[in-house]
Amino acid sequence: MVYSYTEKKRIRKDFGKRPQVLDVPYLLSIQLDSFQKFIEQDPEGQYGLEAAFRSVFPIQSYSGNSELQYVSYRLGEPVFDVQECQIRGVTYSAPLRVKLRLVIYEREAPEGTVKDIKEQEVYMGEIPLMTDNGTFVINGTERVIVSQLHRSPGVFFDSDKGKTHSSGKVLYNARIIPYRGSWLDFEFDPKDNLFVRIDRRRKLPATIILRALNYTTEQILDLFFEKVIFEIRDNKLQMELVPERLRGETASFDIEANGKVYVEKGRRITARHIRQLEKDDVKLIEVSVEYIAGKVVAKDYIDESTGELICAANMELSLDLLAKLSQSGHKRIETLFTNDLDHGPYISETLRVDPTNDRLSALVEIYRMMRPGEPPTREAAESLFENLFFSEDRYDLSAVGRMKFNRSLLREEIEGSGILSKDDIIDVMKKLIDIRNGKGEVDDIDHLGNRRIRSVGEMAENQFRVGLVRVERAVKERLSLGDLDTLMPQDMINAKPISAAVKEFFGSSQLSQFMDQNNPLSEITHKRRISALGPGGLTRERAGFEVRDVHPTHYGRVCPIETPEGPNIGLINSLSVYAQTNEYGFLETPYRKVTDGVVTDEIHYLSAIEEGNYVIAQANSNLDEEGHFVEDLVTCRSKGESSLFSRDQVDYMDVSTQQVVSVGASLIPFLEHDDANRALMGANMQRQAVPTLRADKPLVGTGMERAVAVDSGVTAVAKRGGVVQYVDASRIVIKVNEDEMYPGEAGIDIYNLTKYTRSNQNTCINQMPCVSLGEPVERGDVLADGPSTDLGELALGQNMRVAFMPWNGYNFEDSILVSERVVQEDRFTTIHIQELACVSRDTKLGPEEITADIPNVGEAALSKLDESGIVYIGAEVTGGDILVGKVTPKGETQLTPEEKLLRAIFGEKASDVKDSSLRVPNGVSGTVIDVQVFTRDGVEKDKRALEIEEMQLKQAKKDLSEELQILEAGLFSRIRAVLVAGGVEAEKLDKLPRDRWLELGLTDEEKQNQLEQLAEQYDELKHEFEKKLEAKRRKITQGDDLAPGVLKIVKVYLAVKRRIQPGDKMAGRHGNKGVISKINPIEDMPYDENGTPVDIVLNPLGVPSRMNIGQILETHLGMAAKGIGDKINAMLKQQQEVAKLREFIQRAYDLGADVRQKVDLSTFSDEEVMRLAENLRKGMPIATPVFDGAKEAEIKELLKLGDLPTSGQIRLYDGRTGEQFERPVTVGYMYMLKLNHLVDDKMHARSTGSYSLVTQQPLGGKAQFGGQRFGEMEVWALEAYGAAYTLQEMLTVKSDDVNGRTKMYKNIVDGNHQMEPGMPESFNVLLKEIRSLGINIELEDE
């Protein structure tokens, strides 16, 4: 394997056996690709904004004399960049400008004669833009649009599985679901009549739809039935025979022909009889007259002499009717062929319950059902029916819908119109009747071929279209109002409805969610989440078990493990590692093609629909060198079932063992040894890990860590290769390699790092460089680590030395005992940043003022404020401290004469304002790390605001001039090269000042041209610099766009350092979670023979019942990794020669059977080997991929190499007594996470506080500063103890006896410790409640 310079710093030993055929794809592509499709110009007009515009435009006036046409659109540049938007609290968006053309036609002239054309660019609101990491910044906060899994448009055949009717009869139904428009349902009732519903309203007989489509009874019967033809000859009744139809019937008369009896009366007709009839080519048989009675006529029969209707289609024949028909000369009678087995008389029966008899009555019936209570007119009824399914504006199946529709009806072509045709409706009815007749199967709604993904781009497009349609109405009105000569396109378009629709979607849609930003993994998972909830989806309450369940088609598309616990289980899923969506929005997963029994490296992506036709082998099937299967029988999946197939039957093979799971689950080592429920918890808890102060890569990983860290966007990644030219804490400069430069550029890349900013979850985002000066880097190398990343690998927690043993009950029931050393070394110390805002508004009584002059506040409380009344940076503050002093004018109150006198003497100020300062919330303490002041345009800036501005300007100038210097240096080095090549002596040149170099002339014309080009570039560079500086200055000094009535906003950022303490929640990666019960002194912890104490003691009883054995294997392997690290460390300390180190490290990497990774240290320089050894001294990181991990024997080998016992257990001694514990204990290294459930955020106590309005009881919860509820069970406890007085005070004065508690307060003040309990307020509420039910209830005083 070839490693880049940065990757050589620390190589993970990989235990994977299967070769990696396909690299892990870019993990955020589902978001970025979808949005790209939305905003990029699509010449076909299939997707995105283009499609939305084309579907609404051209807009014609009602008269048709003018129309507004769409030409093209363009997106402008965003005003602020992403960081500025976050700081200012605005949306990161770009203006949308659309070129429209107004065409006015001549009124009197022939059609299409143009009178006037006006073209203009019109502003149509702002479109939020996606950041590079797949998020949106809306009002300053990062949000994610979650993809939705909804039912694909198309036609679905389903049954109620016998649940609707008490008889248990299975009722079948068909539903046509368009992308937008009305749903059309067909369903059978228990009497086998076929009904139709439109938009789930009242049901009507299904034949009404056919009548509305202008079919007569005769045509309807002709469509749905086969015919039986009877002929009257010589007063005998003969029937045309189709032998196949007789199968399974019982003969009601002798079947004879040509004097031969084929079936005797009363006998069952079998296949043998049918073969004989076919062999003798029997076409007609004689039947008795009784046989025809009860048959149904297929068409109308009219007496031609009188013109009178003898019998209408769908009438039952009787002997009288037969005689009439015979008399009027009808010798050939067509009847419907029906039987109970596979040709039911459903449509014929339905026609009998159908009240309508022609098109008009059918249309009226539909109109009455859709618009009850409105008087139907012919026109209204016709237009309503037309608009339901046959109008492009109101109805659209979409390309997906048409494809699914045609596939379901087994048609050849998959493209077609977006509206329904007559044939579509009839074919659906025919297929439904076939299914009722026992031919064909119902669809499985939970099959991923019937559910598709709607991503950001598509949802935004739909919202945008909604806005356009609102505008369309207004435009039509304007076009009709006349005076078109002076009208311009922009006078007609109001951008408000469009931007409102888009804003509503991004701001408040159920699928637009506040990004989960705890750590890089939670970001990635959130962006790859797939929800079945949301508009047009399911609701929690109505979703049954089937929808939530794992389906065979989830394999490789949706993760079977990662889903929330609780009411949303199974409704919110995570995309599998390799899954992607196809053009129709269905999930597909990659497979390796198998041709002629050889597994090739050709990759095909298959959707769930296509996959059903193939036999697919698992990724862990063994192959030989050429790619043949080793075993004769291979475990494969086919049509959702798993079984053994011979190797020639295999069509495809899985790409990777981790294809099944999502990113979160693929980070759990030894996942294959964990119970699914615990794996689910493990995958979910990794997302709650708080980034620690110093990230520590996991010793035991899965090899996915690098992909997650790089794709999440929290690290700085090199865009192009080069050499590190400058590096400090906040920026990295790279001189780009010659071959990667664009022609005519300076060849310098500058990466500015993010420093100590707040995430959505109040954790700290900070980037630290991990390259040093002069290092070569390649494209894609990690230059700086972000939160929870270590040398470009995801690092959510810390490697802790754990022992599985009981310790004095401190690890009872999943409690965790932690050593004090963990606290001392700050292993789990985290930084949290809180943003506190103070808003100064304009009130009716005057503006609020931000000032240090606050009434009735002592000098001490103001000690941390500057003269503007704002806290200074670096101040350490605790709960209740003032951060921003603010006073609010208060209303004039009636003054007493004394007060008037005092005011006259001392002046006004003190009494007419009240203190409304921003204070630190209770229980919070920390350091002020940043202050920002936003001032409204036109409001005078205070001193602090000007200082901050000055500082920002200085910083911006410094940044830009440094940037300029770097670029200049790059440019001048190229100028120097040209001059030297052109014959100028290098020494003389260096003595000349750089600015004068460009004045030199060269004799070589080509070199002179190059020099002139470089001179032009230099001028451009300086010009660009001035432009940038001016733009920055404008941005910094301009006023801010604040909400109405807001004059100033001051934001204060507090950094809080949280050490680990009892009550904090910790977890491993296998769902093994617990709460810290005690921080134990180091000297009391169990220690091994070398005197090394353990860091954490876990309860061994937490393992067997939970069945997550992965944690034990991880512990053993972690021990081995650490053992090898210790040996390398010892060698480094003894300063042994490089060759020995190289040999030992090579041995460690080569260990294990047939490992896919081949590390060849002979290609490394000595310096590189030393650097690698330096990075391995804390332990050799190991990857054990999911379902392809290290085997037990390999772990033992590795333990042996690290000179450790292969049992993984060692003797421990009690730290307090020094005695040995009686049996060896499992000790090793486990990766532990600190979860974002910190005791500091949960601890809370109340002395006095607010009460609920109605019940007058104290509120509950920390946010409301509430009390602890003394509930029903607690009352029982006091009752059981007979503690009557305690109980009385609990239920009265301490809760909601209003008078009692006031009196009590008064008594305590007076020093009289007595209470007088009265009536609790909640009792009065109960009385009122009973009275509201109409029952009078009164308290009688005796």
From Swiss-Prot:
Query: What InterPro entries is this protein classified in?
Result: DNA-dir_RNA_pol_bsu_ext_1_sf, DNA-dir_RNA_pol_bsu_external_1, DNA-dir_RNA_pol_su2, DNA-dir_RNAP_su2_dom, DNA-dir_RNAP_su2_hyb_sf, RNA_pol_bsu_bac, RNA_pol_bsu_CS, RNA_pol_bsu_protrusion
Tell me the name of the encoding gene: rpoB
Q: What is this protein called?
A: DNA-directed RNA polymerase subunit beta
**Does this UniProt record's set of keywords contain Transcription regulation?**
no
The chain residues annotated with the modification N6-acetyllysine are 1022, 1200
Spell out the Pfam families in the cross-references: RNA_pol_Rpb2_1, RNA_pol_Rpb2_2, RNA_pol_Rpb2_3, RNA_pol_Rpb2_45, RNA_pol_Rpb2_6, RNA_pol_Rpb2_7
A single GO cellular-component term on record: DNA-directed RNA polymerase complex
Establish whether keyword Nucleotidyltransferase is in the entry.
yes
Write down the chemical reaction(s) this protein catalyses. Answer: RNA(n) + a ribonucleoside 5'-triphosphate = RNA(n+1) + diphosphate
A Gene Ontology annotation in the biological process aspect, one of them, is:
DNA-templated transcription
Q: What is its EC number?
A: 2.7.7.6
Query: Could you describe the subunit structure of this protein?
Result: The RNAP catalytic core consists of 2 alpha, 1 beta, 1 beta' and 1 omega subunit. When a sigma factor is associated with the core the holoenzyme is formed, which can initiate transcription.
Keyword annotations: Acetylation, DNA-directed RNA polymerase, Nucleotidyltransferase, Transcription, Transferase
Q: Which family does it belong to?
A: Belongs to the RNA polymerase beta chain family.
Question: What Gene Ontology molecular-function terms does this entry list?
Answer: DNA binding; DNA-directed RNA polymerase activity; ribonucleoside binding
Q: Where are the transmembrane segments?
A: none
